[in-house]
């Protein structure tokens, strides 16, 4: 592809795609909170967790039905016909036919009076619903972090492209200056060749930056379920919030009380304990009350005798006590299995705590490190500007060569790119720290929205 060395290069297909796909996106610029809310409506992982929470609630309602009475209606209809020999005298017998038609119904009702296993099953279902709700909250926190990462990836890619384009323009100007100086005999061809090489390299970087921006935009659009999502850029100079609380022990304490992963492990242990108690309850008797009420209407027609009609009723109440005596060691082995699984759940809970504490400490150190990197890069950016100004002045008076100017320019634009990326990563690092502690929510997005151009 030909490169214009006197100015900016012509528009590439990637840039054209960006203009066509996202040129009208300014009207769709959205804050981070708005983008996260939109993603909740389309993200498969979040929607799956929400459906799982709904299913867990319905399983709990199913378990509760064991405490409620059950009733059923049975309706019977029958028609019988029979023929039998009937003596009519001492010497004569005739075949007599009898036809019977009946219609009846019976209502049966049952109520559990005592069943300890049912009680514990309900408690387990309630705990499992709590786990599903915690998983939903965890999925929401994960979605916030993923959207924020994609959101700031777009901004970082846009800043990187701006830096590369600025560097390309500066190199083009330096190339034009080198050519003029060579033509008038004030410089050698070496300066021109160095500027041309830098221009070619800058063009390659610009193409890569354009592609990175396009990929970042497509990724964000897919995550949000919309086309042309345009993140609000960061207000500069940016005043980034510090990591608060400032002590890692405070974050660890928050994680031990609020971490969704730790909550799930602890409730999972409670479920396992209930499973053990439920298995042991297999040794206990059960008591069930039953009630029955039925009515039947019958009509019988007998040849030679006429038709007879009658009604019958029956009602009854009973209590059934079931006492387990021997089950082939089934219950004992069920108890042993539940005890083993309970021990596993206890070990898993201890392991989950260790993992949560480690993740929180790691996220805390990462956030502090990212904050320090932002400060260092911002200082480096200021120093690079001063260095470039001094180099340009030295070039004008003849104590610096063209290569020195090109190096100073590249250093400045690279530092600007890195500083911008570090600021975005610091904001994401803060969200990841709150995610590790289990406190991440919508309110944590509002301070970030305040840092963005509206």
For each feature predicted by the language model, list its residue ranges.
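Gram-negative bacterial Sec-dependent N-terminal signal peptides
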Residues: 2-28
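Acidic, low-complexity, intrinsically disordered peripheral segments
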Residues: 3-4, 81, 418-454
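Periplasmic alpha-helical coiled-coil/stalk elements that build and connect Gram-negative outer-membrane
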Residues: 2-3, 142-256, 366, 370, ...
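Transmembrane beta-barrel architecture of outer-membrane proteins
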Residues: 102-104, 149, 194, 314-316, ...
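A glycine-/polar-enriched beta->alpha junction
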Residues: 37-47, 54-69, 106-124, 134-141, ...
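Bacterial Sec-pathway N-terminal export signals of envelope proteins
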Residues: 27-76, 82-84, 111, 126, ...
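Small/polar, glycine/serine/threonine/aspartate-rich low-complexity segments that form flexible
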Residues: 74-111, 234-245, 277, 290-327, ...
């Amino acid at each position: 592809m030909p490169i214009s060395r006197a100015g900016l290069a012509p528009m590439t297909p990637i840039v054209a795609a960006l203009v066509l796909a996202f040129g009208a996106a300014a009207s769709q610029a959205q804050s981070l909170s708005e983008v996260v809310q939109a993603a909740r409506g389309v993200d498969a992982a979040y929607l799956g967790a929400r459906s799982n929470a709904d299913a867990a609630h319905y399983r709990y309602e199913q378990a509760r039905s064991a405490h409620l009475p059950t009733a059923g209606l049975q309706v019977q209809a029958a028609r019988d016909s029979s023929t039998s020999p009937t003596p009519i005298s001492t010497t004569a017998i005739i075949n007599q036919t009898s036809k019977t038609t009946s219609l009846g119904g019976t209502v049966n009702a049952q109520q559990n009076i005592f069943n300890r296993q049912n009680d514990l099953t309900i408690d387990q279902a309630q705990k499992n619903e709590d786990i599903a709700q915690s998983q939903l909250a965890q999925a929401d926190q994960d979605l916030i972090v993923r959207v924020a990462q994609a959101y700031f990836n777009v901004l970082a890619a846009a800043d990187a492209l701006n830096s590369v384009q600025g560097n390309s323009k500066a190199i083009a100007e330096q190339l034009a200056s080198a050519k003029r100086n060579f033509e008038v005999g004030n410089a050698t061809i070496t300066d021109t060749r160095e500027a041309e090489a830098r221009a070619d390299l800058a063009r390659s970087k610009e193409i890569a930056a354009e592609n990175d921006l396009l990929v970042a935009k497509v990724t964000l659009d897919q995550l949000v379920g919309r086309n042309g999502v345009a993140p609000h850029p960061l207000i500069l100079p940016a005043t980034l919030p510090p990591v608060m609380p400032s002590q890692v022990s405070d974050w660890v304490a928050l994680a031990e009380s609020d971490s969704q992963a730790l909550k799930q492990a602890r409730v999972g242990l409670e479920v396992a304990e209930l499973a053990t108690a439920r298995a042991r309850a297999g040794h206990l008797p059960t008591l069930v009350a039953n009630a029955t009420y039925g009515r039947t209407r019958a009509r019988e027609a007998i040849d030679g005798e006429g038709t007879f009609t009658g009604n019958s009723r029956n009602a009854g109440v009973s209590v059934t006590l079931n006492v387990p005596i021997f089950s082939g060691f089934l219950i004992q082995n069920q108890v042993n299995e539940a005890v083993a699984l309970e021990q596993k759940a206890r070990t898993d809970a201890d392991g989950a705590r260790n993992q949560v504490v480690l993740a929180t400490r790691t996220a805390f150190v990462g956030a502090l490190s990212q904050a320090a990197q932002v400060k260092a890069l911002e200082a480096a950016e200021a120093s690079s500007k001063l260095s470039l100004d001094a180099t340009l002045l030295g070039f004008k008076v003849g104590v610096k060569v063209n290569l020195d100017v090109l190096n100073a320019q590249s250093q400045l634009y690279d530092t600007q790119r890195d500083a911008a990326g570090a600021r975005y990563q610091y904001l994401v690092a803060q969200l990841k720290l709150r995610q590790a502690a289990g406190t991440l929510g919508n309110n944590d997005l509002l301070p970030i929205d305040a840092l963005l151009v509206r």
